[in-house]
A protein has these predicted regions:
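Histidine-centered metal-chelating micro-motifs
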Residues: 50-52, 71, 86-87, 92-98
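Short acidic-glycine-tyrosine-enriched beta hairpin
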Residues: 62, 75-92
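A short, N-terminal "cap"/entry segment at the start of jelly-roll beta-barrel domains
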Residues: 1-37, 122-153
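Short, mixed charged/polar active-site loops
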Residues: 37, 51, 78
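Conserved short histidine dyad/triad with adjacent acidic residue
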Residues: 24-26, 41-57, 94
Length: 153
């Protein structure tokens, strides 16, 4: 029998290491449903919090707002995304985005993309690069640290 988690009845996890302004709840919906090829996460974004820093990935990402109204920053500027809004963030710099909740009510949203690993994210505002190879193996580095291809060989 297939697992069928209800997105309106999730228990959210919080990471104590998240700084103020980025404290959001996450529920790993696709994992609960037994998915392997697509990663679907549900986020509870409290008022005044932001889901993650402005970034882009090298794979398509999607956002569906289930409840509330978020402000979404993209290369074209900021726009509101309210209940039922579906947004696609294309792979690469054109898909850069940041999802924030400047309002007074929580925002409930789904985000999904492929589950390919490693996953690479670029953070243009902080000149940072992130590489994820599983949930427990993350590398975050400043992008300006040039290393010669053969250094250390």
């Amino acid at each position: 029998m297939t697992n069928a988690p209800n997105v309106y009845e999730q228990q959210f996890e919080y990471d104590d290491a998240d700084p103020p302004g980025y404290r959001c709840g996450v529920a790993r919906v696709s994992r609960a449903a037994g998915g392997k090829d697509i990663v679907i996460k549900e986020f509870l974004i409290p008022p005044g919090e932001t889901l993650c820093p402005y970034h882009y990935e090298y794979e398509e990402e999607w956002l569906l707002v289930l409840e509330g109204t978020a402000t979404v920053r993209t290369p074209e500027g900021e726009q509101e995304a309210s209940r039922g809004s579906l947004m696609c963030f294309p792979a690469g710099p054109a898909g850069a985005h940041k999802v924030a909740n400047p309002g007074a009510e929580p925002v409930l949203a789904l985000m999904w993309s492929s589950a390919r690993e490693p996953s690479v994210s670029v953070y243009p505002d902080s000149d940072m690069l992130g590489v994820w190879a599983g949930e427990d193996h993350v590398i975050l580095r400043r992008a300006d640290g040039h290393v010669d291809y053969y250094e250390g060989e």
